[in-house]
Amino acid sequence: MNLTEKWKDLLEAEGADMPEIATATKQKIMSKIFENQDRDINNDPMYRDPQLVEAFNAGLNEAVVNGDHGYDPANIAQGVTTGAVTNIGPTVMGMVRRAIPQLIAFDIAGVQPMTGPTSQVFTLRSVYGKDPLTGAEAFHPTRQADASFSGQAAASTIADFPTTGAATDGTPYKAEVTTSGGDVSMRYFLALGAVTLAVAGQMTATEYTDGVAGGLLVEIDAGMATSQAELQENFNGSSNNEWNEMSFRIDKQVVEAKSRQLKAQYSIELAQDLRAVHGLDADAELSGILANEVMVELNREIVNLVNSQAQIGKSGWTQGAGAAGVFDFSDAVDVKGARWAGEAYKALLIQIEKEANEIGRQTGRGNGNFIIASRNVVSALSMTDTLVGPAAQGMQDGSMNTDTNQTVFAGVLGGRFKVYIDQYAVNDYFTVGFKGSTEMDAGVFYSPYVPLTPLRGSDSKNFQPVIGFKTRYGVQVNPFADPTASATKVGNGAPVAASMGKNAYFRRVFVKGL
């Protein structure tokens, strides 16, 4: 029996506060999370601690039928029990069932549960040449393929493009060209006129544009002559004409589980008075507070991780004019001389579209398909029409949700972008990101290990009760996220300072004057 079948009843359980687990992928992920939680329940005696059972039994008595002999999804959904509770595992499982599926990580990050305290990520990279550590990466989305690599011998006689005096007699030259977006690729040229480079063998975007647009350069690629191909690899007495080679390497990164934990201590007097006056159970109330706080903080960590990893938007290919990283409604350049608010809002949509396209160009996986934004930006998107007249507003007819007391999911923009509200944003901004159809196709990964572990004890000095909750999980950055690190060996996948602002799966733009 696979895990999805094993946990089918719990996955499909319905209740007032039970979020739907609709897709097969999400059900598969949640079944692994349930299995990790179940393993912890069975192995840790804490779940059968009499004091903890007593504390949970009063206010969180969902769980089991006839004691602790199995899970009843209907009871878990309704929060009831029909037998003596001797194991709080099902209670905790119910909390996991309600809380984990609502994490924003399922929408903006890849979710890959861990089966142990450490996991590994393996990355295969194809490279040019014999040395897999120093060779330039092949099949890179932002680097043009070396289109003459297979068309020449390893001991190539094509010279680097000189700084001045390039021959115009049909002699080919090669140079590494850096585009305006910062991409570097090897290209081959014929000089038709005088071309000057600042550095031999290296061509800037301006030098390339001036040369090609001015008719001084043409880009060429070709295979080798048959006579040359026949004499490769020392055939018929020839020498120094080996075949060009390609190789690959496999990079390994380690993901380690980290923890979040909170505790709460209260007096016996508080518990007694709370029960007598309000009919509330202190353990139940504090347990809910602690568990919810852990989940809220985890949600916030994922949003902050995405924003900190995001590249500066409105830069490179997406800048055009105006200040980098900022879309200013009061700047006529940014809004393209808009006359009315509707036209200005459309300019914002165009900028979002450009950022989404840039994500697709750099990742080679797909254009951006979700947006995280402040409330004001979401409101602006809600009042913008991309299809009707130039000044029309109301593409969504105001139907986008901007009330985070309901949900942080605002709606779908133009049938393409899922929009989420950052309810804690301190300034207006939007982040465009991409998540593919699989959990491996994302810029960052959330890897839950043990979702929730309850703890209870008494202070050894004052004998007052103490309760706590712990969660364990890992966070990982996609090893292909930095498009500039294609040739270097990636050894650390943790979200360290060196990786901030370089993740091609996300692009962030601040919004002014809204």
Swiss-Prot record:
<dbReference type="InterPro" id="IPR010762">
    <property type="entry name" value="Gp23/Gp24_T4-like"/>
</dbReference>
<dbReference type="InterPro" id="IPR038997">
    <property type="entry name" value="CAPSID_Myoviridae"/>
</dbReference>
<keyword id="KW-0946">Virion</keyword>
<comment type="subunit">
    <text>Homohexamer. Interacts with the portal protein. Interacts with the capsid vertex protein that forms pentamers.</text>
</comment>
<comment type="function">
    <text>Major capsid protein that self-associates to form hexamers, building most of the capsid in association with pentons made of the capsid vertex protein and one dodecamer of the portal protein.</text>
</comment>
<dbReference type="Pfam" id="PF07068">
    <property type="entry name" value="Gp23"/>
</dbReference>
<keyword id="KW-0426">Late protein</keyword>
<dbReference type="GO" id="GO:0019028">
    <property type="term" value="C:viral capsid"/>
</dbReference>
<protein>
    <recommendedName>
        <fullName>Major capsid protein</fullName>
    </recommendedName>
</protein>
<comment type="similarity">
    <text>Belongs to the T4 phage capsid protein family.</text>
</comment>
<keyword id="KW-0167">Capsid protein</keyword>
<feature type="site" description="Cleavage">
    <location>
        <begin position="62"/>
        <end position="63"/>
    </location>
</feature>
